[in-house]
Amino acid sequence: NVRKKIESFDGPIIFTRDTHDRDYLEHQEGKLLPVPHCVKNTEGWHIVDGLIEAAEGRSIMSPVSFVDKPNFASFELLTRLEGMDKVNPIESITLIGLCTDICVVSNAIMLKAGLPEIPIHIDSSCCAGVTEESHQAALTTMKMCQCIVE
């Protein structure tokens, strides 16, 4: 689903990467979620094989870029999209990815608050949560915050 979505998407693609340092366990997130993950420049940090190639191989010449996010949501993502919107108004934003119930919901609500007039779409077939129950709860939360869950 994800690869097909990327291959057929006709706009700019921004990959966000959960990005932590080796001292992750010393930070609040690491203390509350003591599972080292997405440590910069390790295997678990890289975008899944084939997805970058799918984005770069599209016939549409739209930019592909990356945002390293140190926590659940990314202010850098919001700032970048605000800048893009000023240059060329954004018609809509589509979010896909992992984890629906942590990063996707955090970014969706932040983007909706920062760019309230731009429709925020969530393709639920291209998302997954920690559990099915928490995935569904996140989708419901995003719907309640006026995101369009498909």
Which residue stretches match the model-derived regions?
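Metal-dependent catalytic neighborhoods of phosphoester/phosphodiester hydrolases
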Residues: 24-29
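Solvent-exposed loop/turn segments at secondary-structure junctions
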Residues: 19-22, 128
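Active-site-adjacent betaalpha module
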Residues: 4-12, 31-150
